[in-house]
Amino acid sequence: MSVTLIDINDVEVRLYREDGKVFTSPGVVHLDSDGMLFGADARARLRSNPQGGFDKFWSQLDEVPVAAGPRGIRHHADIAYRHLQHLIGEHGPLKQVLFVVPSDYSRAKLSLLLGIAQALQLEVTGFVDNAVANLACRTLQHQTAQFLDLGLHRTCVSRLEINERVRFASSQTLERSGKNHFGDIVINWIADCFLDQARFDPLQDAASEQQLFDQQDGWVNQLRKSAHINVGLEQHGRLHEISLARDELIRALTPAFTALAAPLAASADVVLSHHFAIYPQELLSNLNAKLAGKTTALETVMACVPELLSTANEVRLCRSLPHATMTAGRNENGS
């Protein structure tokens, strides 16, 4: 039976099939009287109609009552159920699945996720630690490594022990260091640029604020490659245009990225999750870190599926995988 991987991160949930196809959905749901919107459609309303937006249901997966939730939505677990149900409807049918989960997911969250999956008639064959999966196929210089997993609301710093296997050792959650925090910094910086250059404040109008929110990642990614870019936002039929400079973006984000460096050890390899890839290299270089490939963890887990399948009706959390580069090196040496 084929296995589908489901990678849980509130930036985006990813489905990865054995044929290498990847399907993604931002970890956002928008609820209103007309029903539910998911993923990109929900994200497109987060700033223009924020009251109905939910983006913490994966990072805070629990059964704490949601205030003013619509009928049938009691808590974050209900919203996560609907999001997974939507993904299955779009890209299913799914039967046998393996979940790749953040290192800071508690037993309570894993238990809830298992219950949600079983309610959706999914056969869960196991859970795999995301940090372990990302480092298992990397060439590393030290016996200790740290993996920074960027989420919407936090960055999880995992410490791993490296020998013939990659083993999870511990994790630390850095609050106010997630993609939303970086995004708020970027949005405020760009808004200041519009005020200075075009005498236009995009944050004073819900529609233009939503435009800015939608465009920010693309503009940051462009500045990763270019020293300057020209951008524009439209309001009431008028286009406001300005120039953005990479040096100024780096200056705006440097304090936030400096805070990420605080828990990092000098004697450890540091690897960043692929969600950091949109930011300028100068910011990443300050962390003395390397980027993980976009599908590195998923490819690694898929290659290890026989080892990861749970038996005897016990669904296990795997926090240790063979270090592929170590194994390859030993094979090349004939041992």
At which residue positions do the language-model features occur?
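Phosphate/pyrophosphate-binding loops at sites that engage ATP/ADP/AMP, CoA/4′-phosphopantetheine
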Residues: 84-97, 196-205, 257-270
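Gly/Thr-rich phosphate-binding beta-strand-loop-beta motif of the actin/hexokinase/Hsp70
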Residues: 1-32, 137-169, 186, 216, ...
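Helical "lid/coupling" subdomains associated with nucleotide-phosphate turnover
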Residues: 221-334
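Structural motif
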Residues: 7-10, 100-104, 149-151, 272-279
